[in-house]
């Protein structure tokens, strides 16, 4: 079964600690959700993924404007790990950003997004 995590969850705060050796790890279909500042306009995010076996993996970036409905704004494949990669998409206003994993044992080591709620 898939599991979702909020940026308020215990080890999820590590995604913003400037340390690529700490990470949140999930399996295919699992996701991590970040709350954005009120009325945030967003057109991209930088993410450092982590994976022990180094195999490429698919992922999705989804946005929500509230109400629990998420829309996929970016689908891609990660081939490089443990470094920040930039992902751009059409700009929109959103309240939450979600990263959905496409494989088992994939980690999110860091996320850089100025619009993250403090």
Give the predicted meaning of each segment:
Residues 54-67:
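Short, surface-exposed beta-strand/strand-loop-strand elements in extracellular ectodomains
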Residues 71-90:
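Extracellular carbohydrate recognition and processing domains
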Residues 50-52, 66, 104:
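Short coil/turn motifs at secondary-structure junctions
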Residues 25, 62, 74-75, 100:
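Residue-level detector of conserved, well-ordered beta-strand and adjacent loop positions
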Residues 67-68, 118:
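Structural alpha-beta junctions
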Residues 1, 6-38, 48-55, 79, ...:
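Disordered, acidic Ser/Thr/Pro-rich linker "stalks" and the adjacent N-terminal cap
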Residues 19, 31-48, 61, 84-114:
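Hydrophobic/aromatic beta-strand segments within beta-rich folds
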Residues 56, 72, 108-110:
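Generic domain-boundary/flexible-linker signal
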